[in-house]
Design a protein with these regions (language model features):
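Zinc-dependent deaminase catalytic domain
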Residues: 1-156
């Protein structure tokens, strides 16, 4: 297995995706579990996150099961990676972001670009997955922004 432009081999890409998958299990969301992890240029874990409510916000079963209430409060895994890194004084510039669950949405893509993440890796999934179809338009906008800003993305 060769290395990509970030210097990470596909073997390690798959390992980091497995770690993002494990992190996704920490989410309390009953319908969608997303996990994400940022890896530095030397293979070090910089930050991790999963989809959930902000710290201190009550994540009751009622709120989690009501789509409108949940979406008004939930922080996406990718943004939690960014917020957690920022809270700990860690830069994500030049890092690779691994996402398990759904492709990066356009809102999260803005954050990815702004903090200098250079590569986004996601697992291949079934294209007819209902949750994935719901986010397809947003992912298409994210891809366009990634292309324009020089962020590489791939499904493995």
């Amino acid at each position: 297995m060769g290395r990509n432009v970030s210097g990470i081999s596909q073997k390690w890409d798959l390992r980091y995706l497995e770690l993002a998958k494990h992190i996704s299990t920490w989410s309390k969301d009953p319908s969608t579990k997303i996990g994400s992890i940022a890896i530095g240029k030397n293979g070090q874990v910089l930050s991790q996150g999963y989809n959930g409510f902000p710290r201190g916000v009550i994540d009751s079963t009622e709120r989690l099961n009501d789509r409108e209430k949940k979406l008004a409060r939930v922080v996406h895994a990718e943004m939690n990676v960014i917020y957690n890194a920022s809270a700990n004084g860690v830069t994500l510039k030049g890092s690779t972001l691994y996402i398990h669950g759904l492709p990066c949405c356009s809102d999260c893509a803005k954050g990815v670009i702004q903090v200098g993440i250079k590569r986004v890796v996601m697992p291949k999934k079934e294209l007819n997955d209902p949750a994935r179809l719901r986010w397809e338009e947003s992912w298409n906008k994210a891809k366009e922004m990634f292309r324009e800003s020089g962020v590489q993305w791939e499904f493995i």
